[in-house]
Curated annotation (Swiss-Prot):
Role played: Plays an important role in the de novo pathway and in the salvage pathway of purine nucleotide biosynthesis. Catalyzes the first committed step in the biosynthesis of AMP from IMP.
Obligatory cofactor(s): Mg(2+)
Name the UniProt record assigns to this protein: Adenylosuccinate synthetase
Cellular component, GO annotation: cytoplasm
Organismal lineage: Eukaryota, Metazoa, Spiralia, Lophotrochozoa, Platyhelminthes
Species this protein is from: Schistosoma mansoni (Blood fluke)
Length: 426
């Protein structure tokens, strides 16, 4: 890992529509970190890490917890489903992770996801019919709605007076005019499990930053194009997945954010509905989907496939100002005769190139995409660990992407395992 500026926090963010392979970069960078944090989202996120021959699926736990020397922090911007969290902890322990509970800290300001939120999520998606947003139905959006309307419940409420907590929960149910459901958790057992993990994460993180003794890494969930403000609204998630969410989701000053790393796939994927200019609806897309094992970690839904879209990534760069990029899954493209890169959008009515990323999804749905077409390399890149080992055409692909984006590509993923990665000195 590039040495962090003393006292500053490093951040890993997705620059497409999620599922870029952020977990792999976090796993690599966390080897030289002492603290890894989540700052937003909930168990609608899905990170996969392959370590020691074991495959781990993370939804709420920071994936950097795979490193046994890391303290994992779930920040105040995360919404927490306790059942899902405890199940994830149990599964991680069963797979051999050590001291998970003792290495985990949960902000007492985290809002709680209840079954009522999940039921609202399901019902709202059904009511939308063919205009559904394709949510994970995990109750994340309704929980953030409760937070914004100021009738949500937080971890600190659960840890406080139970009578008051019950009264607040009844008010929540009354507000959304739903029948009082069961919590679906054993409250006393949950309190016992939580007792050693809950803390004021704002104080904890800022003390660690000011001490200049902790190397802190923040792993973003979802991605910039799913950001509630900057994504392809309304087909977005309910939190800020961009660099601003790091500050609000952890209680950090912007001046504490040091390096920001973006993660992109060598192609593009998207789960659920929403505009997707470079989408492939032919046999090539189907081939990439199968070879890349493109199924949602959380939803198990088949991911939509498209060519790498540099218009999207340039827009994400404007918002996040990436210091460097990780390009993942280049090996999935090994068998293709040619590879395309989206480099511009044309307005079909005027014939002119758009000078900015459209905020209106209806406009984005109708843009004409301009592609750069490159020859495929027709040679396996799987497991390559040195840049010079890549076929010439694969290196041309990487360098063309760099040129179109004007951002250095420091890491190149060449397989699922944690050591299938090329680290470039750029």
């Amino acid at each position: 890992m590039t040495k962090s500026v003393e006292g500053l926090v490093s951040v890993v963010l997705g620059a497409q529509w999620g599922d870029e392979g952020k977990g792999k970069l976090v796993d690599l960078l966390s080897e030289s970190c002492s603290v890894v944090c989540r700052c937003q989202g909930g168990n609608n996120a899905g990170h996969t890490v392959v370590a020691g021959g074991q495959e781990y699926f993370f939804h709420l736990l920071p994936s950097g917890i795979v490193n046994p020397n890391v303290l994992a922090v779930i920040g105040n911007g995360v919404v927490v489903n306790l059942q899902a969290l405890f199940q994830e902890i149990d599964e991680a322990v069963c797979k051999g992770l050590l001291d998970v509970s003792s290495r985990l800290r949960i902000s007492d300001r985290c809002h709680l996801v209840f079954d009522i939120h999940q039921e609202i999520d399901r019902m709202e998606e059904e009511l939308r019919g063919e205009n559904s947003l394709g949510t994970t139905k995990k109750g994340i959006g309704p929980t953030y709605s409760s937070k914004v309307t100021r009738n949500g419940l937080r971890v600190c409420d659960l840890m406080g007076d139970w009578v008051q907590f019950t009264a607040k929960y009844k008010e929540l149910v009354k507000y959304v005019k739903r029948r009082y459901p069961k919590l679906g958790i054993n409250v006393e057992e949950s309190l016992e499990k939580l007792s050693g993990m809950v803390c004021d994460s704002v104080i904890l993180i800022n003390k660690l930053v000011k001490s200049k003794q902790a190397n802190i890494l923040v792993e973003g969930a979802q991605s910039c194009m799913l950001d509630i403000d900057f994504g392809t609204y309304p087909h977005v998630t309910s939190s800020n997945c961009s660099v601003g969410g790091v500050c609000t989701g952890l209680g950090l000053s912007p001046s504490r954010v040091g390096r920001v790393y973006g993660v992109i796939k060598a192609y593009t994927t998207r789960v659920g509905s929403g505009p997707f200019p470079s989408e492939l609806l032919d046999g090539i897309g189907e081939f990439i989907q199968k070879k890349g094992c493109e199924w949602g970690v959380t939803t198990k839904r088949k991911r939509r496939i498209g060519w790498l879209d540099t218009v999207v990534i340039r827009y994400a760069h404007i918002i996040n100002d990436f210091n460097a990029l990780a390009l993942t899954k280049i090996d999935v493209l090994d068998d293709l005769e040619e590879v395309k890169i989206a480099k511009a959008y044309i307005d079909p009515e005027t014939g002119r190139e758009l000078d900015s990323f459209p905020s209106d999804s209806s406009v984005l749905n109708h843009v004409v995409v301009v592609y750069e077409t490159l020859p495929g390399w027709k040679t396996s890149t799987h497991g390559c660990r040195v840049y010079e080992e890549l076929p010439t055409a694969a290196k041309v692909f990487v360098e063309t992407v760099e040129k179109l984006l004007n951002i250095p590509i420091r890491w190149i993923g060449t397989g699922a395992s944690r050591d299938s990665i090329i680290i470039r000195s750029v």
